Swiss-Prot record:
Pfam families: Astacin (PF01400). Keywords: Cleavage on pair of basic residues, Disulfide bond, EGF-like domain, Glycoprotein, Hydrolase, Metal-binding, Metalloprotease, Protease, Secreted, Signal, Zinc, Zymogen. Glycans are attached at residues 67, 185, 337, 370. InterPro entries: MetalloPept_cat_dom_sf, Metallopeptidase_nem, Peptidase_M12A, Peptidase_Metallo. It comes from Caenorhabditis elegans. Residues 30-208 form the Peptidase M12A domain. Transmembrane segments: none annotated. GO terms for molecular function: metalloendopeptidase activity; zinc ion binding. Its EC number is 3.4.24.-. It is found in: Secreted. The active site is at residue 120. This is Zinc metalloproteinase nas-20. One of its GO terms (cellular component) is extracellular region.
């Protein structure tokens, strides 16, 4: 069986043969040299005593990567250099390719998810944690004695993103790893794959469409897909060949007065960690040159803990459509109902999780001109 997969990763330069990840202690400097890249952009892998549900999880992760990069995966139990994916005591992976070796990548039930599968594969491709970036002190307050938080000699090919699948959650019981911007308290540790995660992976492995005869004018932060140069990879809420369409997206026209909308259904609360997140998108439009304002007014049935890992809502107000804006999943967070303003038109709202995270409501309006409103709480 042969599986072809494409995906993006963070570039590292440094020391080989170290373990990454959850429930595993590591050397403080674990970056990799370029020789740790997989040759010909192809990884060989196979499953070993891996439960069927975890196999399905990895196939989803591989298919995702295949659709977003020029990388390929080949299922090959006889390969001299390969990744053996098995059940273990924790979720971890070696960094990069180890020539002539069968290297282990493990999952355990207490940490297994689609996002974790992507996270560990990206380690095997040569990507370090977000908290190990050389610029992390501009964005995080960390305990440098923590073995997972040592700065590595990374090549920062994309902006720092609090929503990266490679970034650990904040530590809710201490100040060992907290965001300098407190609005990202619940965003760190998300199990979503961020747009910049794939951009990074593509840049690291040189995946691009530079030699393709047709150049596409991708819109709204999108870029030509190295997996299929006849289409663009699109940011949240956009689709179509050039990322200028909203098929399957709720398109709402903002007015000068506050209007209300949301997602309302009767499913019971719950989570399914082994599947890809399901998304519902809203695109709020307004006259050209306007500022669009949005505020969440109700959250119900979301799984709430110290990070919005399995479900949540993102009001994408950041000017850079590729970056992750603060995530919301808990109505006891004093930031959850802040008014967000953006000149991005349309203004995109993303709800993620599954149909068991049932209910959120929001209000929206536009203000003529480029107005920047200070965040406010609803009373």
């Amino acid at each position: 069986m042969k599986i072809t997969v494409n995906f993006l990763l963070v570039a590292l330069i440094g020391v080989p043969s170290v373990l990454s990840d959850r429930h595993i202690t590591r050397d403080k400097r674990q970056a990799m040299r370029d020789y740790a890249k997989w040759e010909n952009n192809k990884m060989s892998l196979f499953f070993y005593n891996l439960p069927l549900e975890m196999q399905a999880m990895f196939r989803d992760a591989i298919n995702y990567l295949e659709n977003h990069t020029c990388l390929k995966f080949e299922y090959n139990e006889n390969a001299e250099t390969a990744v053996r994916i098995r059940k273990g005591n924790g979720c971890y992976s070696l960094y990069g390719m180890h020539a002539g070796e069968v290297q282990d990548l493990t999952l355990d039930y207490n940490c297994a998810s689609f996002g974790t599968a992507v996270h560990e594969i990206m380690h095997a491709l040569g990507i370090a944690h977000g908290q190990a970036r050389s610029d992390r002190d501009d964005y995080l307050i960390v305990d440098s004695t923590n073995s997972n938080d040592g700065i590595e000699n990374t090549e920062n090919l994309v902006p720092f993103d609090y929503g990266s699948v490679m970034l650990y959650a904040r530590d809710p019981h201490s100040d060992k790893r907290i965001p300098i911007d407190p609005e990202y308290n619940f965003t760190m540790g998300s199990l979503r794959v961020a747009f910049y995660d794939m951009v990074l992976l593509n840049k690291f492995y040189g995946c691009n469409c530079d030699n393709h005869p047709r150049k596409l004018d991708c819109k709204n932060g999108g870029y030509q897909n190295p997996a299929n140069c006849e289409e663009c990879l699109c940011t949240d809420g956009f689709n179509g060949q050039l990322c200028d369409q909203h098929e399957g997206v709720y398109v709402l026209e903002a007015k000068k007065e506050w209007d209300a909308s949301g997602v309302r259904n009767n499913y019971r609360k719950g989570i399914e960690t082994n599947t890809m997140p399901e998304y519902t998108y809203f695109a709020l439009t307004a006259p050209e040159g306007s500022t669009i304002e949005v505020r969440i007014t109700k959250l119900s049935g979301f799984f709430c803990q110290h990070t919005c890992d399995y479900n949540g809502v993102e009001l994408k107000y950041k000017t850079d459509r590729r970056i992750v804006s603060p995530l919301v999943c808990c109505d006891n967070d004093n930031l959850w109902n802040k008014t967000r303003s953006s000149t991005n038109n349309p203004f995109i709202i993303a709800k993620y999780g599954n149909n068991r995270t049932p209910h959120f409501e929001f209000e929206y309006r536009y203000i003529p001109g480029n107005a920047t409103a200070a965040p406010e709480e609803n009373n």
